[in-house]
Amino acid sequence: MLAYWFLFALFALPALTERMRHPDDPRPQRLLAIFGVVMALMIGLRFHVGADFEAYELIFRRAAEIDLARSLQRGDPGYQFVNWAVGQLGGAMWQVNLICAAIFVWGLIRLCRAEPSPMLAALVAIPYLVVVVAMGYTRQAVAIGFIMAGIASLSRGGSVIRFALYVAAAALFHRTAVLVLPVAIFAGRRNH
């Protein structure tokens, strides 16, 4: 439990002083990246944490034993590919989790940087999105990571096509991600 409080405090302390800093100060952006690495390590290096941990271990063992074509037919191709590649390289399940955690955190940090208070945005994500979703549901977390990166792209003026590509990447890890595509319809509209 102490590890979760540590992660929360890591983002909470800088979030308290975030508004007092000059907008051009690069330190908060670097700090967010460093803390993102810590977050990815905590998510990726977890052991027997999460509702589907045993199922994911079984997926990994099976993917490592078969050829790529058969592995991709067994489920979400992005997740199957990561499992297959790590298995072929002689890796372990924790490496799959770490790769997936890195993708999730990358998307989260991209989205947080698009917000006025990035540290606060990351802090708000920790109790549920990080601890429950990212540590409990690996495939969904990767899909959400790509979706968050897509939303960040849209908020910075990125094209709807780019957003759709992020959603397509998300769907490689969890097919339900395609349900987010209608968000693109509202991308050009602004409330004033």
Report each predicted region and the residues it spans.
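Terminal, non-globular segments
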Residues: M1-H192
